Amino acid sequence: KVDWSEWHGTTTQEPPYDQLEPRFAATVIYRGCTWKGRMMDCSVGGTNGAFMAYREQSYSYGKTTTGYFLRKLLDEKLIDVKGTKSSQAWVEIRFAEVLLNKAEAAYRLNKTTEAQSLMNRVRGRQGVNLPGKSSSGEAWFNDYRNERKIELAYEGHLFWDMRRWRLAHIEYNNYRCHGLKITNGTYEYIDCDGQDRKFPQKLYVLPVPTSEIKNNALIEQYDE
């Protein structure tokens, strides 16, 4: 596992992207990678994918506030954007998600071996080829959470997973998004949104619709 502590400050050391698992390069565009035949430069003043500081206003297209862009689910050969339309189809569900969902169900039923096998099928598939996990109990669930976060990144699951697991008020309170600001080869760890996230526990439950309360005087709204 890569130690990122050096990049939680300011350094001229190049991030060890080549030491990360294959899904990193398949998920994001970063400085030094290629996209549509261009070498990407996500630094201040970069010619392809320049950095732009966070602000609570509109942004210019083709710039980043984190030092990274999204690559996942995009086909370099198909991208053709016209206004709000694109030739890129949205992938609603993948087989990897099916396997992970089933693995979690097996875990809840105390079927440890089945849960391990299903998650390891995701990790060991062609193009990823990562060793399997043999943990069990709470340790397995922690591994599973991390696996799901990586495998399903940017597919719209993490927020709802955290709600489903009742962990959002722990993971998201006082949380900020961070990134790397690159200036003349210097990497600076920065806040990307300028504010702490908040998740009060009342958000785990949706309010009772006003129409239902009007229909039945015995129904009361949640206190929170």
Locations of regions flagged by a protein language model:
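Surface-exposed intrinsically disordered loops and tails
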Residues: 2-5
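Flexible, polar/acidic helix-loop-strand segments at domain edges
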Residues: 7, 11-95
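Alpha-helical structural motif
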Residues: 16, 20, 66, 118, ...
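Extended, hydrophobic/aromatic-rich amphipathic alpha-helical segments that build helical scaffolds
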Residues: 20, 24-29, 90-122, 141-151
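Short loop/turn segments at secondary-structure transitions that flank enzyme active sites
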Residues: 30-36, 128, 150, 168
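Charged alpha-helical initiation segments
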Residues: 68-74, 117, 124-127, 149
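Long, intrinsically disordered, low-complexity segments
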Residues: 85, 90, 123, 131-224
